[in-house]
From Swiss-Prot:
InterPro entries: AAA+_ATPase, ABC_transporter-like_ATP-bd, ABC_transporter-like_CS, MacB-like_ATP-bd, P-loop_NTPase. This is Putative ABC transporter ATP-binding protein MG065 homolog. Belongs to the ABC transporter superfamily. The keyword ATP-binding applies. Signal peptide: none annotated. It comes from Mycoplasma pneumoniae (strain ATCC 29342 / M129 / Subtype 1) (Mycoplasmoides pneumoniae). GO terms for molecular function: ATP binding; ATP hydrolysis activity. Residues 232-465 form the ABC transporter domain. Pfam families: ABC_tran. The keyword Nucleotide-binding applies. Transmembrane segments: none annotated. ATP binds at G268, P269, S270, G271, S272, G273, K274, T275.
Length: 465
């Protein structure tokens, strides 16, 4: 039996809708599709592993059904969470972030179940001592990744210790029972597997509670003294994520200071945490623990509304997936960015921007009439038009050809020089790093190296071939 995957489900190609009824229809259709897929998978698991315990997969599936029913019943009241007021439309991106999170939680339990029982089905002879050592190693690894912060409520940290102590005691009792009763090897194997599943569930359930708490805004801390030299400062920053079943540390103990007016590049392999780092310093997300101070403001204390206001006042963001409003023309999309700048004198001339990115002759076109590279150019112009204090970009030149990449990068550097803007971008292109005042190398959620460049190159000085 093959593994389950979210990609087996079909999603709409559209990204936005202005019709609340359409939002409900899309939600209902997708959740029904997911339910049928998961129900079929659960039946197949029962058929293939009828003698195995299906407690966790079945329980998680039932939780999903209950959540689905509640979600659809309450959608008329809760649909505002998917509504972008500024653009007057519902976002399918926001909708499917929520729906997929629920479906993935069930899929994770199905796949974990498959992993466990495929291992059990291996032909090698079961050895109790080896299995117990593997069990200890597994739980040791779980404990190393436990979420922690000094801010955590005492009852959650104490619960972790209680679970560890109870598990050790119960394992000793189980091994004594096996030594006394000497059951067959296959029963010993089942007893240990059941023990692992049960205690893993308890441990991760508490971890999910901890991470959920950590990802909420903190109580307001003491006022931060602005650092005139460094516009961004991170101290011991962690970011944990959860799908409702398991947890993962994406950033691990990040310490970082970024100077104002610098051009900064973040490099790292896929899954290294570089986009998460960008999201946290740009106010797109909060850290789970530690301190993130941007322009003198402590980000971990901000609620969602305050983060939105922070981005509106100080940040321009160039999204990897463009993020253009589909019912607005090229020019109108750029004007949206410009209008976020409350001081009209600070706005950058839209005609000059469109000319610079080669889109002035297409300014009356809608996004669906443009290529991917053209949409990215509009996204870049929109971020620049506001003339924000900080500009962040997630692969901002990823969809551009070589010639336009160079044109856009020249525009980046010109705006930085003229307006003293601080710019931070994530990229896979090592050549772009030669333009940076500072290069941050990220791997496995940690900063592996910082490379300051006292004499950054100009675009025309780089061999782009």
């Amino acid at each position: 039996m093959r593994y389950f995957a979210l990609t087996d489900l079909t999603k709409p190609t559209a990204k936005f809708t202005t019709d609340a009824m359409e939002l409900r229809q899309i939600s209902n259709a997708y959740l029904n599709q997911a339910q049928a897929y998961l129900q079929k998978g659960l039946k197949q698991l029962k058929k293939d592993y009828k003698n195995a315990i299906l407690y966790t997969p079945k329980t998680e599936y039932k939780r999903f059904l209950k959540w689905k029913q509640t979600f659809l019943q309450d959608l008329n009241q809760t649909q505002k969470r998917f509504f972008i007021v500024r653009a007057q439309h519902f976002s399918y991106v926001l909708l499917f972030n929520l729906l997929d999170e629920q479906v993935e939680a069930v899929i994770a339990t199905f796949n974990n179940f498959l992993d466990e029982h495929r291992l059990e089905a291996q032909s090698k002879q079961f050895d109790l001592d080896t299995a117990v050592n593997e069990l200890h190693d597994y739980f040791d690894q779980l404990q190393k990744n436990t979420a922690y912060s000094e801010d955590l409520p005492t009852h959650l940290t104490q619960k972790t210790e209680q679970l560890i102590n109870a598990r050790n005691t119960q394992l000793t009792n189980l091994l004594n029972k096996i030594a006394t009763t000497k059951p067959p090897l296959n029963k010993q194997q089942r007893l240990l597997a059941s023990f692992r599943n049960y205690h893993e569930h308890l441990f991760l359930k508490n971890e999910v509670k901890k991470v959920t708490w950590l990802n909420e805004p903190r109580a307001k801390k003491e006022s931060v003294t602005p650092d005139e030299e460094h516009i961004i400062e991170l101290k011991n920053v962690y970011k944990y994520i959860t799908n409702g079943v398991t947890t993962n540390a994406v950033l691990k103990g990040i310490d970082l200071k970024l100077k104002a007016h610098d051009f900064i590049v973040i490099l790292g392999p896929s899954g290294s945490g570089k986009t998460t780092l960008l999201n946290i310093i740009s106010g797109m997300d909060r850290p789970s623990s530690g301190s993130v101070v941007v322009n003198g403001q402590e980000m971990i204390c901000m609620n969602d509304r305050q983060l939105t206001n922070f981005r509106r006042n100080y940040v321009g963001y160039i999204f990897q997936q463009y993020g253009l409003l589909p019912n607005l023309t090229v020019r109108e999309n750029v004007e949206v960015g410009a209008n976020l700048q409350r001081n009209p004198d600070k706005r950058i001339n839209i005609d000059e921007l469109l000319e610079a990115v080669g889109m002035k002759h297409l300014q009356k076109k809608l996004p669906n009439e443009l290529s991917g590279g053209q949409q990215q150019r509009v996204s870049i112009a929109r971020a620049f038009a506001k003339n924000p204090l900080l500009i962040f970009g997630d692969e901002p030149t990823g969809a551009l050809d070589l010639e336009m990449t160079q044109i856009v990068l020249k525009q980046f550097l010109a705006i930085k020089q003229r307006y003293k803007t601080t710019m931070v971008i994530v990229t896979h292109n090592n050549l772009i790093a030669q333009l940076a005042d500072l290069v941050i190398y990220v791997a496995d959620g940690k900063i592996q190296a910082l490379q300051a460049n006292p004499n950054p190159k100009q675009v025309e000085d780089i061999n782009w071939i």
